Amino acid sequence: MSSTRPELKFSDVSEERNFYKKYTGLPKKPLKTIRLVDKGDYYTVIGSDAIFVADSVYHTQSVLKNCQLDPVTAKNFHEPTKYVTVSLQVLATLLKLCLLDLGYKVEIYDKGWKLIKSASPGNIEQVNELMNMNIDSSIIIASLKVQWNSQDGNCIIGVAFIDTTAYKVGMLDIVDNEVYSNLESFLIQLGVKECLVQDLTSNSNSNAEMQKVINVIDRCGCVVTLLKNSEFSEKDVELDLTKLLGDDLALSLPQKYSKLSMGACNALIGYLQLLSEQDQVGKYELVEHKLKEFMKLDASAIKALNLFPQGPQNPFGSNNLAVSGFTSAGNSGKVTSLFQLLNHCKTNAGVRLLNEWLKQPLTNIDEINKRHDLVDYLIDQIELRQMLTSEYLPMIPDIRRLTKKLNKRGNLEDVLKIYQFSKRIPEIVQVFTSFLEDDSPTEPVNELVRSVWLAPLSHHVEPLSKFEEMVETTVDLDAYEENNEFMIKVEFNEELGKIRSKLDTLRDEIHSIHLDSAEDLGFDPDKKLKLENHHLHGWCMRLTRNDAKELRKHKKYIELSTVKAGIFFSTKQLKSIANETNILQKEYDKQQSALVREIINITLTYTPVFEKLSLVLAHLDVIASFAHTSSYAPIPYIRPKLHPMDSERRTHLISSRHPVLEMQDDISFISNDVTLESGKGDFLIITGPNMGGKSTYIRQVGVISLMAQIGCFVPCEEAEIAIVDAILCRVGAGDSQLKGVSTFMVEILETASILKNASKNSLIIVDELGRGTSTYDGFGLAWAIAEHIASKIGCFALFATHFHELTELSEKLPNVKNMHVVAHIEKNLKEQKHDDEDITLLYKVEPGISDQSFGIHVAEVVQFPEKIVKMAKRKANELDDLKTNNEDLKKAKLSLQEVNEGNIRLKALLKEWIRKVKEEGLHDPSKITEEASQHKIQELLRAIANEPEKENDNYLKYIKALLL
């Protein structure tokens, strides 16, 4: 990278000094913002930003250069006096890293330090072309206006959101509680990248609540942008929306939406400056988002279930597009997330839709079953699926990106890509038709295929024929197919025809010169002597450097430049013709540009049709991807039987597997059964060795439920699954310590959110709750929360814990069931010397409570020192005896007062017995035989047994029973 870096250049010393002087006069830079200067062919970054770029992009500080500052400027220069230059190619990497991976904002200035472009994670429009890459999810930015109710502690959040990549705008009101769990679900479902909120620092009470809102936004991986409260006024917003939507519908919006959401929308329109660009006007569509239509997922669930590839800075995954064939497992070739596992999509739109489905699992059983029916159909129709995924879907372009490009700086090449897309629609229709004709037309699944895929595709074939006719009439398709040239047909415009005729004549002359030169120099014109249209020299010829010595023998050849590929040269006649050709070509392009713009404008009128077709094909692509994944898993996935909400609450999984873990080459995975049934065992407490088995077990239940509700088959032998309205997780502190939040505080905050958010139809996953504080406090917290979930909420819950005492909850509540991880250890007995690879831990989850001696067993296997193992066994036995005694007392149902009073009476008996032993001189071991000592102990036991009992003397009764 550093070898291609350009140098920072100035015309003179004065320009250089002025450059740095203006830099020192810029306003203070906001946090997490990078500033760049556009120097034309390259970009420059200065100060701490330069160090950031050196470390993050170049991965070395050797690329840094010293700024040349005069003494006066140096005094005002409060940054490291370093700079680094960035080429156009590296710029794309830098922008992607800042905006999509790290959540930074970017400001780009011209040479005079005037701001010309700015971008943020939710608004990349101004730098989209510079990034030059596909994005695997929509770039959605939201705005929030909050109104708190001091009486009940709840609040109403007016929300507006805009997807600038898809030209969509929406509004809604969210009624939320004090932990803002509904807001969290909204941010997760839409994958919001940036949130605009009110700056309420002047109001201490409201600011404290707003800080809680900001913490929730931050937890969801969103960038927070503070705006003045005045920006959230709803004044005149309906007029702005009328311009954006292109109709009068917006005038009725105040009757449909609250002042809060309208005010939030006003802030959003102003922040994005949507009305400042003419190409935005009339392009937007008003959409609705209903939270209850989708399963709720909290931020912890996204990470705990490994839905997306996670990086050190980006726990919610990268936005860089990954189409199957280049990534399913990402760049490393290893599947680490559900997204990578399921991503066998062939289209960019399909990848985006898969990303959306993973964040928005369905809760309507009929809609889920439709997806399952379609997956089933494509699994059975192997030939159809292979034709679609190998011949047709890979040829589908990114329509959203193309139409957006046509709106700005599109060209004939983009029009032809859409034309090719249009031509493929009838072919796909024909493929479906032929397969459906071979099957029984009355089968329900065939009707579903017709309604979901075939009918929408067929419906638009006729309108698109007019578009295709327009392209075929105006564009020279022969020139494109033969020479990859994008030209208007000469017969379509008389003036263009004349110029084209002259160009053809000149090109014939150029080819003639090429052939004559080949004969003169003695080289084959097809293999040795190349004719090229060079970006600097125009039409010229090229020879390899080894063959170029022949040129020196002929004076008429003029050398132009020497590169690694060879030597470019020309003749006086060829240079003249090349110059004339260049002039005519520019005139042709100028004449053609007006016609091209007209063709583009006509093409854009078909945008709604193209986008609808793209969505249909994206849906087909994702379903085909599910079918592929289900068919080619190590053990094929099966279709689950679903139970709707508010009906039979039963989830029963036979031989379930974690879909991501079973794909790892270095893991031997054991399948497990899972049964969750309302009232009989809907709360599972899982104990066992702290080596991964418990965590995997509870998470795979969540992953399988989510897979079923997005429409995919599941990794089981048999599966009954109750649809859940939420998956809520508390599985670890993550990087919270880096943000100044203690592990215990994170546990409290996340658990509070779960308790507020969960309903009887939810699935709660808790892993090792209570580790962030002392053992006693942690156990108390875990017990109280577990008891509340099991007795008050009554939803499905999986509770993995290291507190074995928690298993006693099953004696109190009938719906609590204990499970434990059995760790089977295999050791290679042939090897006399221990090796780490000798041990294989295989986890199986079975009913009951875990054997707590597992750790000592492992210590013996790995040849721990014998002395330490014996000490550990002795200590464990002491603790077991103590625990057994305590458990026996609990079973006897003795109160603490009864135990204390009974102990006083026993002590009195013991003192009397000791007094008699001393009187008889038997307290000295050297003066008493073993037989005599046994006789004295029996006397003590008889004394206890004959002690008269008082009324309700339960403790003495208990002791006497033990002596029988």
Curated annotation (Swiss-Prot):
Changing S561P: Causes strong defects in MutS alpha mismatch binding. Defective in MMR, but not in NHTR. Changing S695A: Has a dominant negative mutator effect. Changing K694A: Impairs ATP binding; reduces catalytic activity 1.6-fold for ATP hydrolysis. Has a dominant negative mutator effect. Changing K564E: Causes strong defects in MutS alpha mismatch binding. Defective in MMR, but not in NHTR. Keywords: ATP-binding, DNA damage, DNA repair, DNA-binding, Nucleotide-binding, Nucleus. Changing S742F: Defective in MMR, but not in NHTR. SUPFAM superfamilies: DNA repair protein MutS, domain III, P-loop containing nucleoside triphosphate hydrolases. Residues 851-964 are annotated as: Interaction with MSH6. Changing Q430K: Partially defective in a mismatch repair assay. It is found in: Nucleus. ATP binds at G688, P689, N690, M691, G692, G693, K694, S695. One of its GO terms (cellular component) is nucleus. The keyword Membrane does not apply. Changing D524Y: Partially defective in a mismatch repair assay. InterPro entries: DNA_mismatch_repair_Msh2, DNA_mismatch_repair_MutS-lik_N, DNA_mismatch_repair_MutS_C, DNA_mismatch_repair_MutS_clamp, DNA_mismatch_repair_MutS_core, DNA_mismatch_repair_MutS_N, DNA_mismatch_repair_MutS_sf, DNA_mmatch_repair_MutS_con_dom. Transmembrane segments: none annotated. Pfam families: MutS_I, MutS_II, MutS_III, MutS_IV, MutS_V. GO terms for molecular function: ATP binding; ATP hydrolysis activity; ATP-dependent DNA damage sensor activity; double-strand/single-strand DNA junction binding; four-way junction DNA binding; mismatched DNA binding. Heterodimer consisting of MSH2-MSH6 (MutS alpha) or MSH2-MSH3 (MutS beta). Both heterodimers form a ternary complex with MutL alpha (MLH1-PMS1). MutS beta also forms a ternary complex with MutL beta (MLH1-MLH3), and possibly with a MLH1-MLH2 heterodimer. Both heterodimers interact with proliferating cell nuclear antigen (PCNA/POL30). This interaction is disrupted upon binding of the MutS heterodimers to mismatch DNA. Interacts with SAW1. Belongs to the DNA mismatch repair MutS family. This is DNA mismatch repair protein MSH2. The gene is MSH2.
